[in-house]
């Protein structure tokens, strides 16, 4: 730790009235670009307008101005998020059966959307129980509301109004911090202050206030709800907060106030800050006393972390010093220069953040089913499937975004003259070794993982089940995964004092939690079938990484095109007269990477959906016999490609295909429509620009004949625009098809 003399006291960190507010300016399309502001001559103008509106780098090269625009845009984004959240709460208040669900969450299904009868579509309002007709929702909002202690639709209504107030506040802040008091560049680059505020403020105080809410409001209300008390009889949140005796009746240690805290007798608080592990048998969710304890612990960690970095007091760590101290025996200058990169290139910063947030989102997807955090979430199979699928897709997109912005950084912000022998330079210098090895790994994984399936299909087709890779013939058990499962199942006795169960029931140990005759969670067995599909996961993920990493490492130059940096981030080919140079831009790698990301995530969500229906989800009889939705057919059926097609895709599509005439029919229409959107994408992906330009000119001729030709000259999409439209429809169509397939199936059988 370095002690320095204190900094000068007051720095002026904002510019006042930096840019005047002008509605005339905003009303002029393309006001941010000299070329676009001239107005449309050809139809390409509208595409350029969309491509460049938020590409602040193209408006100006002044880093301070770019930073201010990004900062202001973030407030706009937050305002939209608050507006959306407010809408969710408003639907809960105005169009939902929340209060009915709260009184009987095992038999009544959540609904917060009611279709108006205009052309007979009120058929979509299915009977969700409790005398309510509406569309069953699978977002998990009801479960979150119960966990936070919301007991009436009036409370939802008030929260919705609060959301609108915050949305307005954010819009104002976005305007204020760009037009009235715009921060200087030095403020954006003061990373130590930023870390302290984000760690201690957002994460530390955020977690602490949530822990406080859980202890003083959620826990007591949920305690009453679990005991079967009518929600209308439960005291209101402010009564618990203001009246300590109320809480002391439920949690005796409250009677002692803060004395145990200051006398370090913390174990007194163990009645509401627990460390049990496992699930609450009443609700099938994590113990809320465990989650309150968790948020308190997280808050302490982040409050400490938020006091580690050196600001005005000359004490603590400096980020630059930390980075420059990172030097290994084989890493040359190590992290020297990284500080400058991350404080002057927001693309580099964003790339790191997207990579971490994407990975974290995928971790969340897995925790939502393995450790279901909210009451009655685990037995709501539609919501479980939706939350997993949603977080997997989002994680995939964020990780591709990380590669996109890393490549933009390489093209626009990387300065090779100042970087020598630091880690990034060394990675770039042996990029051929990295990419060729990665390519070898992809080939190995592809042939071997696919080969195992092809072997099984062949043996199955020839009627030789004894020669197949399966749990009953030639076993390929995932021994490492099973070892990890067993270690965790045995851990509570050895690691966490007072923990009565392991972190997740999925690890093993024979415990099963069922709520209202439905399985919430049980140990998930892994076998040969999982071993096979896990290697498909490894294959698709490695190919995605290969494409994206090649795009980043060869963004500035390659043997084929040494001056690639001069061509920019996205370009169709290296100019006329140079054949075989198409699809080499960094943008094209992102484009191709998106398809493989789609492959990867599709296999993951198919695996999850079938595995859970086969081995986890189902009903339990009074005798304790579990009947799974698909009767445990995953282990024997998913070991052939034919099995995936026959017993998963085809067998489980019957609900969506036969949904016409029922309340699920919207999913049938979506299934059809999304297939069409997906097929429509192929038209953009398989045809070249010239084909369309010829067709357009013929159509323009006809318009001229009839004297109805437009003033703006029609143009075919550019090559890059065509690819962008193609991949968008491909992903949108594919994801919406999967969504309709999953939901119609799980709502019908779950």
Swiss-Prot record:
<keyword id="KW-0603">Photosystem I</keyword>
<feature type="transmembrane region" description="Helical; Name=XI">
    <location>
        <begin position="724"/>
        <end position="744"/>
    </location>
</feature>
<feature type="binding site">
    <location>
        <position position="582"/>
    </location>
    <ligand>
        <name>[4Fe-4S] cluster</name>
    </ligand>
</feature>
<dbReference type="Pfam" id="PF00223">
    <property type="entry name" value="PsaA_PsaB"/>
</dbReference>
<feature type="binding site" description="axial binding residue">
    <location>
        <position position="675"/>
    </location>
    <ligand>
        <name>chlorophyll a'</name>
    </ligand>
</feature>
<feature type="binding site" description="axial binding residue">
    <location>
        <position position="683"/>
    </location>
    <ligand>
        <name>chlorophyll a</name>
    </ligand>
</feature>
<feature type="transmembrane region" description="Helical; Name=IV">
    <location>
        <begin position="291"/>
        <end position="309"/>
    </location>
</feature>
<dbReference type="InterPro" id="IPR020586">
    <property type="entry name" value="PSI_PsaA/B_CS"/>
</dbReference>
<keyword id="KW-0411">Iron-sulfur</keyword>
<keyword id="KW-0460">Magnesium</keyword>
<keyword id="KW-0813">Transport</keyword>
<keyword id="KW-0157">Chromophore</keyword>
<dbReference type="GO" id="GO:0015979">
    <property type="term" value="P:photosynthesis"/>
</dbReference>
<feature type="transmembrane region" description="Helical; Name=III">
    <location>
        <begin position="195"/>
        <end position="219"/>
    </location>
</feature>
<keyword id="KW-0004">4Fe-4S</keyword>
<keyword id="KW-0812">Transmembrane</keyword>
<keyword id="KW-0560">Oxidoreductase</keyword>
<dbReference type="GO" id="GO:0009522">
    <property type="term" value="C:photosystem I"/>
</dbReference>
<dbReference type="GO" id="GO:0016168">
    <property type="term" value="F:chlorophyll binding"/>
</dbReference>
<keyword id="KW-0408">Iron</keyword>
<feature type="transmembrane region" description="Helical; Name=I">
    <location>
        <begin position="70"/>
        <end position="93"/>
    </location>
</feature>
<feature type="transmembrane region" description="Helical; Name=VI">
    <location>
        <begin position="385"/>
        <end position="411"/>
    </location>
</feature>
<feature type="binding site">
    <location>
        <position position="692"/>
    </location>
    <ligand>
        <name>phylloquinone</name>
    </ligand>
</feature>
<feature type="transmembrane region" description="Helical; Name=X">
    <location>
        <begin position="664"/>
        <end position="686"/>
    </location>
</feature>
<keyword id="KW-1133">Transmembrane helix</keyword>
<keyword id="KW-0602">Photosynthesis</keyword>
<dbReference type="InterPro" id="IPR006243">
    <property type="entry name" value="PSI_PsaA"/>
</dbReference>
<feature type="transmembrane region" description="Helical; Name=IX">
    <location>
        <begin position="589"/>
        <end position="610"/>
    </location>
</feature>
<dbReference type="GO" id="GO:0000287">
    <property type="term" value="F:magnesium ion binding"/>
</dbReference>
<comment type="similarity">
    <text>Belongs to the PsaA/PsaB family.</text>
</comment>
<feature type="binding site">
    <location>
        <position position="691"/>
    </location>
    <ligand>
        <name>chlorophyll a</name>
    </ligand>
</feature>
<feature type="transmembrane region" description="Helical; Name=VIII">
    <location>
        <begin position="531"/>
        <end position="549"/>
    </location>
</feature>
<comment type="subunit">
    <text>The PsaA/B heterodimer binds the P700 chlorophyll special pair and subsequent electron acceptors. PSI consists of a core antenna complex that captures photons, and an electron transfer chain that converts photonic excitation into a charge separation. The eukaryotic PSI reaction center is composed of at least 11 subunits.</text>
</comment>
<dbReference type="GO" id="GO:0016491">
    <property type="term" value="F:oxidoreductase activity"/>
</dbReference>
<keyword id="KW-0793">Thylakoid</keyword>
<dbReference type="GO" id="GO:0009535">
    <property type="term" value="C:chloroplast thylakoid membrane"/>
</dbReference>
<feature type="transmembrane region" description="Helical; Name=VII">
    <location>
        <begin position="433"/>
        <end position="455"/>
    </location>
</feature>
<dbReference type="GO" id="GO:0051539">
    <property type="term" value="F:4 iron, 4 sulfur cluster binding"/>
</dbReference>
<comment type="function">
    <text>PsaA and PsaB bind P700, the primary electron donor of photosystem I (PSI), as well as the electron acceptors A0, A1 and FX. PSI is a plastocyanin-ferredoxin oxidoreductase, converting photonic excitation into a charge separation, which transfers an electron from the donor P700 chlorophyll pair to the spectroscopically characterized acceptors A0, A1, FX, FA and FB in turn. Oxidized P700 is reduced on the lumenal side of the thylakoid membrane by plastocyanin.</text>
</comment>
<feature type="transmembrane region" description="Helical; Name=V">
    <location>
        <begin position="346"/>
        <end position="369"/>
    </location>
</feature>
<dbReference type="InterPro" id="IPR036408">
    <property type="entry name" value="PSI_PsaA/B_sf"/>
</dbReference>
<keyword id="KW-0479">Metal-binding</keyword>
């Amino acid at each position: 730790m370095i002690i320095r003399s204190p900094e000068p006291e007051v720095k002026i960190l904002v510019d006042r009235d930096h840019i005047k507010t002008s509605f005339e300016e905003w009303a002029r399309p393309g006001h941010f670009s000299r070329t676009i502001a001239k107005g449309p001559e050809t139809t390409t103008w509208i595409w350029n307008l969309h491509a460049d509106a938020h590409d602040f780098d193209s408006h100006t090269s002044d880093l301070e101005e770019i930073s201010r625009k990004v900062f202001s845009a973030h407030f706009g984004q937050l305002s939209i998020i608050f507006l959306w959240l407010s809408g969710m709460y408003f639907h809960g208040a105005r169009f939902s059966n929340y209060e009915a669900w709260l009184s009987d969450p095992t038999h009544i299904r959540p609904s917060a959307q009611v279709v108006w009868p205009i052309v007979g579509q009120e058929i979509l309002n299915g009977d969700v129980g409790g005398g309510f007709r509406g569309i069953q929702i699978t977002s998990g909002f009801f479960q979150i509301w119960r966990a936070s202690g919301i007991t009436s639709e009036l409370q939802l209504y008030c929260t919705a109004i609060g959301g609108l107030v915050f949305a307005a506040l954010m819009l104002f802040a976005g305007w204020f911090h760009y037009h009235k008091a715009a921060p200087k560049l030095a403020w954006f680059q003061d990373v130590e202050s930023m870390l302290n505020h984000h760690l201690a403020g957002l994460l530390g105080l955020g977690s602490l206030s949530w822990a406080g809410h859980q202890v003083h409001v959620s826990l007591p209300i949920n305690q009453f709800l679990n005991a079967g008390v009518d929600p209308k009889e439960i005291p209101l949140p402010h009564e618990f907060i203001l009246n300590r005796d109320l809480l002391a009746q439920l949690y005796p240690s409250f009677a002692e106030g803060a004395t145990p805290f200051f006398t370090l007798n913390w174990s007194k608080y163990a009645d509401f800050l627990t460390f049990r592990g496992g699930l609450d048998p009443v609700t099938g969710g994590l113990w809320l006393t465990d989650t309150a304890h968790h948020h308190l612990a997280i808050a302490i960690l982040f409050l400490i972390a938020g006091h580690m970095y050196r600001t005005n007091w000359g004490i603590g760590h400096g980020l630059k010093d930390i980075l420059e101290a990172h030097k290994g025996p084989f890493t040359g200058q190590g992290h020297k220069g990284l500080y400058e990169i991350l404080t002057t290139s927001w693309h580099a910063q964003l790339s790191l953040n997207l990579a971490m947030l994407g990975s974290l989102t995928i971790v969340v997807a897995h925790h939502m089913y393995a450790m279901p955090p909210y009451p009655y979430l685990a037995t709501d199979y539609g919501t479980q499937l939706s939350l997993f699928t949603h977080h997997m897709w989002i994680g995939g997109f964020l990780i591709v975004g990380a590669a996109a912005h890393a490549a933009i950084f390489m093209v626009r912000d990387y300065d090779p003259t100042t970087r020598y022998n630091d880690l990034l330079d060394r990675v770039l210098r042996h990029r051929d070794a990295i990419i060729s090895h990665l390519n070898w790994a992809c080939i190995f994984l592809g042939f071997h993982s696919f080969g195992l399936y092809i072997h099984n299909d062949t043996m199955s087709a020839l009627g030789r089940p004894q020669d197949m890779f399966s749990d009953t013939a030639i076993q390929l058990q995932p021994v490492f995964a099973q070892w990890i499962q067993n270690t965790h199942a045995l851990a509570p006795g050895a690691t966490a004092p007072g923990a009565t169960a392991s972190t997740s029931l999925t690890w093993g140990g024979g415990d099963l939690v069922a709520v209202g005759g439905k399985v919430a969670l049980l140990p998930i067995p892994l076998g040969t079938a999982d071993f096979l599909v896990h290697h498909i996961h490894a294959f698709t993920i490695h190919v995605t990484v290969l494409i994206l990493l090649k795009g980043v490492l060869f963004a500035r130059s390659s043997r084929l095109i040494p001056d690639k940096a001069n061509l920019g981030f996205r370009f169709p080919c290296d100019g006329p007269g140079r054949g075989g140079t198409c699809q080499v831009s960094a943008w094209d790698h992102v484009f191709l990477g998106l398809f493989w990301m789609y492959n990867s995530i599709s296999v993951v969500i198919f695996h999850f959906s079938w595995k859970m229906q086969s081995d986890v989800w189902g009903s339990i009889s009074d005798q304790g016999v579990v009947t799974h939705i698909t009767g445990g057919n995953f282990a024997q059926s998913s070991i052939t490609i034919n099995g995936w097609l026959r017993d998963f895709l085809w067998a489980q599509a019957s609900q969506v295909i036969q949904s016409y005439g029922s309340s699920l029919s919207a999913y049938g229409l979506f299934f059809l429509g999304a297939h069409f959107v997906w097929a429509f994408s192929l038209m953009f992906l398989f045809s070249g620009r010239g084909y369309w330009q010829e067709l357009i000119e013929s159509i323009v001729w006809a318009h001229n004949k009839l004297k109805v030709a437009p003033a703006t000259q029609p143009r075919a999409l550019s090559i890059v625009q065509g690819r962008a439209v193609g991949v968008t429809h491909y992903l949108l169509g594919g994801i919406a098809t999967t969504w309709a397939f999953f939901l119609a199936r799980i709502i019908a059988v779950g």
